Amino acid sequence: MKAVSPVRPQSRKAQVPAVCGELALHCLSEHSLGVARYKMEEEETLCLQYDMNDCYSRLKRLVPTIPPNKKVSKVEILQHVIDYILDLQLALDTHPVLLRQQPPTRTPLTDLNTDPAALVVNKQGDSILCR
């Protein structure tokens, strides 16, 4: 029985054109690029997740109705945040000092649009952004 060498003979290597070597390098680099892209997407996803977790932690610290030593889910944090915002809005709407204040006087927009003399801006609040 004849022993077969696992290494290709030199004559066979000489027959393989140089293009195959370049193609192999190209395929390898394409594969490396694909792996690198995948890793970048994975890292971006992780960064986004860490950012979101950081935001939830910050909300948990800022909203006084969330117990500090109790573990709460993200949904519970959002529910507390919504309730807190609604409470703040209600407090602003019903605050006695704010209710007594007169709204600032300003020229109605209909007068500004119909009267050419009113195009001159007298006050900062009277300016119209789009003309």
Curated annotation (Swiss-Prot):
Short name of one Pfam family: HLH
Sequence ranges assigned to domain bHLH in this UniProt record: 36-88
Gene3D superfamilies reported in the protein's UniProt record: Helix-loop-helix DNA-binding domain (4.10.280.10)
InterPro entries, sorted: bHLH_dom, DNA-bd_prot-inh, HLH_DNA-bd_sf
GO molecular function list: bHLH transcription factor binding; protein dimerization activity
Subcellular location: Nucleus
A single Gene Ontology CC term: cytoplasm
GO biological process: negative regulation of transcription by RNA polymerase II
Domain of life of the organism encoding this protein: Eukaryota
Amino-acid biosynthesis as UniProt keyword: no
Keywords from the named record: Developmental protein, Nucleus, Repressor, Transcription, Transcription regulation
Subunit-level organization: Heterodimer with other HLH proteins.
Biological role: Transcriptional regulator (lacking a basic DNA binding domain) which negatively regulates the basic helix-loop-helix (bHLH) transcription factors by forming heterodimers and inhibiting their DNA binding and transcriptional activity. Inhibits the activity of both neurogenic (neurog1/neurogenin, neurod1/neuroD) and myogenic (myod1/myoD) bHLH factors.
Name of the molecule in the record: DNA-binding protein inhibitor ID-4
